[in-house]
Amino acid sequence: MDLSKVIDRPEAGDGTNYLIVGSDSREGMSDEDKKKLHTGSAEGKRTDSMMILHDGSNGPTLISLPRDSDVEIPSFVGSKSGKKYPGRGRHTKLNAAYAEDGPELLVRTVEHNTGLRIDHYVEIGFAGFAGIVDAIGGVEMDIPKAFKDKKSGADFQAGKQTLNGEQALAFVRTRYAFAGSDLDRTKNQQKFLAALANQTATPATILNPFKLYPTLGAGLDTLVVDKDMGLFDLGSMFFAMKGVTGGDGKSMNMPIAGTVGGNLRWDKAKVAKLVDQLKKDEPVTVSGN
């Protein structure tokens, strides 16, 4: 993935901004895997989750971008055709940008609608996600309330438990079991990623490529990063993710002001203030939904 192909980019601010994407890529999965992981068998791939992780001098901030967010698709250069497509003021769900022209258009759309420059892009598919969780021996979670969801395969009791790859995927994909649907799901995704980072982001793992590479290697079949992102950058991202739940760290959903055409409409004033604080690497005082 080449960020230099993204046009009309915002100026860089202080700190580092990662766009972290979970896709529904089924690449390398057998029919048995798809059935076991409750992924379905849709062709192509779409974004199942999107987050911005800001790492700066005032602690990391993790912001979930609901896939049903109402956004404007701006002008862009086709990732394969090289042709420039003009912006026509067309509004759609955020995850449609990825479906239309992949990571480059998703980054372009996020930057256009937020004004925040993305420094690094990280994407992982279903099988890779489950593989990484299994590679570290599972992730311990404290689930406050029992829930079930046939679509994702989730069936959890309340309390502390260690989730394997299959269970972890079901946990982060569940939306229909919650009243808030996508907004509740993004909160669970944040909790899980923080727990995953707490177990993987230790100096013994991050600073030792012989330990870090096998851990990430379990997901390499479906791992996509921008061409300038190395192992050190991935390690820094894991450390920042770990810090989200401690000290000055903060996790939130993008501030929402209501709905439009069935999509979630961002609160423009709050988003503008949030982006300004991130650009200046100031403590985030804005709250999300």
Regions found by a protein language model. Give the residues of each.
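Non-catalytic, solvent-exposed segments at the cell envelope interface
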Residues: 1-289
